[in-house]
A protein has these predicted regions:
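Short acidic/polar active-site loop segments enriched in Thr and Asp
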Residues: 42, 150, 178
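Positions that flank functional sites
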Residues: 53, 159-160, 187
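Conserved small-residue-rich beta-alpha loop and adjacent elements
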Residues: 104-170
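A glycine-rich helix N-cap at a beta->alpha junction
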Residues: 171-187
Length: 200
């Protein structure tokens, strides 16, 4: 094992990195209530959360494919170029991390090895609010794509008019995400762990 000695200043950084985050109890309780409500009441609870927290009434959670396909129309070419560059660089970085399957046969016929298999699906969450986070789309989705995950699902909150942030949506379209849900918060994260919601 390699031993690395840290200077006193570096130790302060290490202590910060190793610090366990503690959420305030009221936040934990609120998230727990949302989870219990969605598990018990499904889509109705998700709609209620979207209305309470995001101020939007949604009839359908899943974004229609035609809206995804049209996401790049009218965007500043400089933004699209920057997006393509960022996605390319992040892809190149994560390609170096990809583990390969390997097998070997011993003289006695025993086969040894490691089979690396991607997950069947990955869910990513892109925060909303007053700012747009297209970088969150790339940073979360591209590693899964490089790993060979065949299905990537994205959730992001809609604005009060029911629309998604155009930059976030365009980024998802550009890198190839085709399954997108308009919802935020803890209720959105439940999308990845339960059959609700699955509307078209």
């Amino acid at each position: 094992m390699k031993t690395i000695k840290l200077a006193p200043g570096e130790r302060l950084v290490t202590n910060q990195l190793n610090r366990k985050g503690v959420l305030p109890q009221n936040i934990v309780d609120a998230a727990r209530d949302i989870v219990a409500n969605v598990r018990a009441n499904g889509d109705a609870a998700v709609r209620d959360c979207c209305q309470r927290f995001d101020g939007v009434e949604l009839q359908s959670f899943r974004l229609p494919q035609e809206q995804i396909d049209a996401a790049l129309e009218g965007l500043d070419p400089a933004f699209v170029a920057a997006l393509e560059k960022a996605a390319r660089q992040i892809r190149e970085f994560h390609q170096r991390e990809v583990e390969q399957s390997w097998f070997t046969t011993r003289p006695d016929g025993t086969i040894l090895g490691v089979k690396v298999t991607p997950l069947a699906a990955a869910g990513i969450y892109v925060p909303g609010g007053t700012a747009a986070y297209p970088s969150s789309v790339i940073m979360n989705a591209v590693p899964a794509m490089v790993a060979g995950v065949p299905r990537i699902v994205m959730a992001a909150p809609a604005s009060r008019d029911g629309r998604m942030n155009p930059y976030v949506l365009a980024t998802a379209r550009k890198i190839g995400i085709t399954e997108i849900y308009k919802m935020g918060g803890a209720q959105a994260c439940l999308l990845y762990t339960s059959p609700s919601p699955r509307d078209g």
